[in-house]
């Protein structure tokens, strides 16, 4: 092996860090390995990049778990024994074209021979909060900026006089009790909003909550070793109503048996079941886009019309009244391995992997009403409600066969390796 290789001390990387997946465990611990979360939504995958986004196609590295491709986020971090990162394109000589952007090699924990059953339980609980949010211009700063823009006749887009608006805001700042609702209609029916509101705080809870639990038992006899593990991860996001959340259950089992001196059989079974609820994008620019683009004077309080109280046109309304998208995934992987050592220095390994992934994706846009931006009337979030359901599965089969022969001639140590790989993947969705 030539080229840049980095190893990760998984115990130090995990420590007491509150993480939900392996991506978070590797974030910031390997120089040159860039791992980013583009959404912050609980359960969303992170993106990987080893040589930078300016590399050809900006591709992601190949991830191998016990020598077989697998979704890195379906592994319980507590099941990992070691992680190695092959950073340069030389790894393609061993793993093929898919490794052109690097390789992440993950080895999971196994039992040890001649060891009494050992039980282990880990947990951690943590809270999350948005640390940095965009700072918006105050209502007065916004109106003064409108004046500097030089609107024709000192009139803003919806017909209100900008100088008059400035006067209302200054009076509101001096005498807020005169404007209990934070807005006023003039004699011509023009609406002047004056109160400064925090769109982000309106749509977020004080904290998000995360918990991880992991239980395992391992051991072995003179000729066998085993390890069983069960893990649970739960994360509630920071949006109101807790509609952004993620739950995952991991189970794994490993068994190794020395049938005789030259034959060893191994069976590795892994299963993961996850459910992700994520807020659908609503409003003119999506939930986060609306919170960012709407001015700070935008009303967030409900408004009564015809004796009925309706919510305002805000991101918080889209979150509270909208239905979340539900994504359910199952991932079952079975790996069987036979290791034969017929001669001194010769080891022949045969592997068969079966992986089945199922996915359920439900999107429902329900219909609800809210008050428009300038209290001009009732609006519908959609003309008609929508429902979409996508279900699918992927079956993956792989065969690996390789042999290593190590021998010495004089003062020279020689190692010869040859291998064969065959993969088949079949995917259906409807």
Predicted regions: what they are:
Residues 1-252, 264-266:
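Short, small/polar-rich motifs associated with maturation and membrane association
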Residues 93, 214-215, 335-337, 356, ...:
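Short secondary-structure capping/turn segments at boundaries of alpha-helices and beta-strands
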Residues 98-100, 259, 342-344:
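Short loop/turn positions at the edges of beta-strands in beta-sheet-rich folds
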Residues 14, 18, 205, 209, ...:
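Catalytic cores of large soluble enzymes that bind and process phosphate-bearing ligands
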Residues 113-196, 233, 237-333, 349-430:
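Surface-exposed loop/interface segments of Gram-negative outer-membrane beta-barrel transport/assembly proteins
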Residues 26, 31, 292, 296-300, ...:
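Proline-centered flexible-loop/turn and helix-kink motifs
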Residues 108, 219-221, 257-258, 269, ...:
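Residue-level signature of outer-membrane beta-barrel architecture
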């Amino acid at each position: 092996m030539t080229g840049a290789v980095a190893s990760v001390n998984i115990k130090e990387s995990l420590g007491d860090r509150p993480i939900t997946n392996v991506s978070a465990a590797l974030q910031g611990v390997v120089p040159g390995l860039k791992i980013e979360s583009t959404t912050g939504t609980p359960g969303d995958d992170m993106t990987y990049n080893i040589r930078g986004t300016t590399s050809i196609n900006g591709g992601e590295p190949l991830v191998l778990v016990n020598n077989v491709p697998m979704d890195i986020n379906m592994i319980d971090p507590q099941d990992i024994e070691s992680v190695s990162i092959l950073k340069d394109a030389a790894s393609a000589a061993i793993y093929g074209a898919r490794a052109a952007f690097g390789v992440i090699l993950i080895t999971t924990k196994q039992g040890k021979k001649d060891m009494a059953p050992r039980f282990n339980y880990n947990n951690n609980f943590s809270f999350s909060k948005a640390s940095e949010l965009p700072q918006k211009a105050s209502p007065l700063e916004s109106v003064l900026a409108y004046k500097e823009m030089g609107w024709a006749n000192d009139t803003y887009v919806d017909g209100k006089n900008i100088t008059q608006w400035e006067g209302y805001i200054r009076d509101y700042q001096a005498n807020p009790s005169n404007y209990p609702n934070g807005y006023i209609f003039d004699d011509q029916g023009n609406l002047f909003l004056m109160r400064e509101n925090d769109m982000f705080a309106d749509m977020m809870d004080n904290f998000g909550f995360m918990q991880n639990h992991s239980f395992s038992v391992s051991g072995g006899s003179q000729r066998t070793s085993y390890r069983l593990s069960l893990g649970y991860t739960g994360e509630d996001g920071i949006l109101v109503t807790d509609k952004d959340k993620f739950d995952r259950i991991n189970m794994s089992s490993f068994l190794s048996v020395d049938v005789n001196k030259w034959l060893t059989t191994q069976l590795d079974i892994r299963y993961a079941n996850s459910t992700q609820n994520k807020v659908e994008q609503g409003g003119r620019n999506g939930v986060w886009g609306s919170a960012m683009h709407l001015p700070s004077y935008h009303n967030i309080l409900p408004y009564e019309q015809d004796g009925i109280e309706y919510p305002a046109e805000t991101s918080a309304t889209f979150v509270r009244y909208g239905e979340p998208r539900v994504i359910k995934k199952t991932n079952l992987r079975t790996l069987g391995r036979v290791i034969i050592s017929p001669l001194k220095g010769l080891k022949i390994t045969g592997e068969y992997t079966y992986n089945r992934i199922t996915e359920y994706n439900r999107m429902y846009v329900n219909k609800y009403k809210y008050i428009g931006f300038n209290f001009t009337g009732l609006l519908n979030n959609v003309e008609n409600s929508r429902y979409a359901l996508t279900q699918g599965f992927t079956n993956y089969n792989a065969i690996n066969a390789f042999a290593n022969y190590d021998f010495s001639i004089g003062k020279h140590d020689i190692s010869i390796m040859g291998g064969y790989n065959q993969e088949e993947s079949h995917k259906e969705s409807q």
